[in-house]
Amino acid sequence: MASMQKRLQKELLALQNDPPPGMTLNEKSVQNSITQWIVDMEGAPGTLYEGEKFQLLFKFSSRYPFDSPQVMFTGENIPVHPHVYSNGHICLSILTEDWSPALSVQSVCLSIISMLSSCKEKRRPPDNSFYVRTCNKNPKKTKWWYHDDTC
C-alpha cells in the first residue's frame, strides 16, 4: 500500500473514531474511493452558524500529505462568511501556502470550525462575484491574497 493510502487510512480511522466537534465523516463518500471524502458539519453552539448544516468536500492527490488536500464547501448550504465564496471555495492559508505534511484532515476541520466560530458578521468576500465568475474549479489553483486573520 502506498504511503499516501496508508496515511489516508490512518486519518480516516481518526476521523471516524474521534471527530472534531460538529463533524461527521459521510461514510458513503469513502466507499468508492479513499481519495475523496465528504465531511458533514454542524455550526457550533453559540456562533452565528449554530444549528446550520454544511458539507465539506476533501480531495486528495497522489502526493498527499506533501501536497495539501483540495477542500471546499459543497451541497445546498454554503456558509455566508468573509472567507468563503458562494461557490464553496475557502480562503484559508493552511489549504495552500501554509500547508505542512504534519497537518491532517482533523487539523483542517478544526481550522474551519475556528474560522466559522470567530465570525462576527455573515457576509461574502468583497470580490465574491468577480471571483466566482473567473476562478478555476480547483481552489488550489487560485493565488490567494490573505489580507486579514479576522472576519
Curated annotation (Swiss-Prot):
Q: What SMART domains does the record point to?
A: UBCc
Cross-link annotation Peptide (Met-Gly) (interchain with G-Cter in ubiquitin), location = M1
Ranges where the UBC core domain occurs: 3-151
Single GO molecular function: ATP binding
| UniProt-listed Enzyme Commission number(s) | 2.3.2.23, 2.3.2.25
What's one GO BP annotation on this UniProt entry? protein monoubiquitination
User: Tissue-wise, where is it found?
Assistant: Widely expressed, with highest expression in brain, liver, pancreas and heart.
**By its UniProt entry, which Gene3D superfamilies does this protein fall under?**
Ubiquitin Conjugating Enzyme
GO cellular component: a single term: cytoplasm
Q: What is its main location?
A: nucleus
Q: Does the keyword Transferase apply?
A: yes
Location within or outside the cell: Nucleus
Presence of keyword DNA damage: yes
**What pathway is it annotated to?**
Protein modification; protein ubiquitination
On modification after translation, the UniProt record reads: Autoubiquitinated at Met-1.
Q: Which UniProt key words apply to this protein?
A: ATP-binding, DNA damage, DNA repair, Nucleotide-binding, Nucleus, Transferase, Ubl conjugation, Ubl conjugation pathway
Catalytic residues at C91
Instruction: Describe the reaction catalysed, as an equation.
Output: S-ubiquitinyl-[E1 ubiquitin-activating enzyme]-L-cysteine + [E2 ubiquitin-conjugating enzyme]-L-cysteine = [E1 ubiquitin-activating enzyme]-L-cysteine + S-ubiquitinyl-[E2 ubiquitin-conjugating enzyme]-L-cysteine; S-ubiquitinyl-[E1 ubiquitin-activating enzyme]-L-cysteine + [acceptor protein]-N-terminal-amino acid = [E1 ubiquitin-activating enzyme]-L-cysteine + N-terminal-ubiquitinyl-[acceptor protein]
Question: How is the quaternary structure described?
Answer: Homodimer. Interacts with FANCL. Interacts with STUB1/CHIP.
**What family is this protein classified in?**
Belongs to the ubiquitin-conjugating enzyme family.
Query: Briefly, what is this protein's role?
Result: Accepts ubiquitin from the E1 complex and catalyzes its covalent attachment to other proteins. Specifically monoubiquitinates the N-terminus of various substrates, including ATXN3, MAPT/TAU, POLR2H/RPB8 and STUB1/CHIP, by recognizing backbone atoms of disordered N-termini. Involved in degradation of misfolded chaperone substrates by mediating monoubiquitination of STUB1/CHIP, leading to recruitment of ATXN3 to monoubiquitinated STUB1/CHIP, and restriction of the length of ubiquitin chain attached to STUB1/CHIP substrates by ATXN3.
Identify this protein by name: Ubiquitin-conjugating enzyme E2 W
What gene name is given for the protein in this entry?
UBE2W
